[in-house]
């Protein structure tokens, strides 16, 4: 029942999000930063200039698949997209929220700069429609693929360096 659905969500739709390393989450967050550079450059620039920890805030959004951040109806629509499209739907939703509500961040004084305004009051239909915008769809898919490829390359590099240090290679011991 419900537990099987949760296990499937964690294992298949969000691989690496809920394990001890959270590597899948870190890859998605790297992609998210790149997606925002493409889809909301002014907002991304302000976040960087203000030193706003997007990674820290997005952790809750992505791990909890927006259950604690969006109105329930919007969350359920995002989940529909997640089940259909996979984790890229979470990046598209976040990019859509920044696109729709980025003006609130751009106009906010730095002393009250709060990322929660991005998701507050999101209209369910509007956030889903915006997340399906071709520019957002392409940016999210491209940046997630790039981040995943970089992660695989880095993991291979680290594994190879570890094998060299221990004196082993793929074919066994060297020497």
Model features per residue range: what roles?
Residues 1-175:
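Helix-rich, well-folded core regions that mediate interactions or catalysis
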């Amino acid at each position: 029942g419900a537990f099987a659905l949760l296990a499937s969500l964690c294992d298949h739709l969000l691989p690496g999000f809920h394990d001890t390393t959270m590597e899948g989450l870190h890859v998605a967050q790297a992609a998210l930063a790149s997606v925002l550079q493409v889809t909301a450059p002014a907002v991304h620039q302000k976040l960087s200039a203000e030193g706003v920890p997007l990674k820290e805030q997005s952790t809750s959004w992505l791990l909890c698949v927006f259950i604690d951040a969006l109105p329930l109806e919007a969350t359920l629509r995002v989940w529909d997209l997640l089940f259909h499209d996979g984790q890229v739907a979470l990046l598209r939703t976040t990019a859509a929220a920044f696109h729709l509500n980025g003006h609130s961040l751009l106009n906010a004084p730095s002393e009250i700069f709060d990322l929660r305004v991005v998701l507050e009051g999101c209209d369910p239909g509007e956030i889903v429609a915006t997340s399906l915008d071709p520019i957002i769809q392409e940016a999210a898919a491209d940046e997630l693929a790039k981040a995943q490829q970089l992660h695989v390359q880095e993991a291979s590099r680290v594994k190879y360096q570890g094998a060299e240090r221990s004196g082993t290679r793929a074919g066994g011991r060297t020497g």
